[in-house]
Amino acid sequence: GVRTAWHTHPAGQNLIVTQGKIYTGTADGIIQIARPGDVVLCPPGVKHWHGAGLREDGEHIAVTFEKDGKNVTWLEHLSEDEYKSLVEKADESKKVD
């Protein structure tokens, strides 16, 4: 699936989902699934990634704020295996018996 690398924003970021499903994960293991109309708030300094699902597209508008002329710090890439594992875990936790 298409996703960002891990990154942080010194002044935060808002993700506005416009189509499909968007996954957002943080370094502490929290994964959110957002759908059209949802807004995901990424607080300043929180290490995170975001992207589409494994078998479906997702689109979002990212609104990023600046602090001292800087809006993002890019970090390490999220490997395909790690991404797949995180998205599958998030999907599994949302299933209803």
Predicted features along the sequence, with ranges:
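Conserved short histidine dyad/triad with adjacent acidic residue
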Residues: 1-9, 44
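Conserved strand-loop elements at the edges of beta-sheets that form or border functional pockets
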Residues: 8, 16, 34-36, 52
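Short, conserved beta-strand element in jelly-roll/cupin
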Residues: 8-24, 63-66
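Residues that flank catalytic or metal-binding motifs in active/ligand-binding sites
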Residues: 10-13, 46, 56
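Acidic beta-to-alpha connecting loop that harbors the catalytic carboxylate
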Residues: 21, 46-47
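Short acidic-glycine-tyrosine-enriched beta hairpin
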Residues: 28-45
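Double-stranded beta-helix
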Residues: 49-97
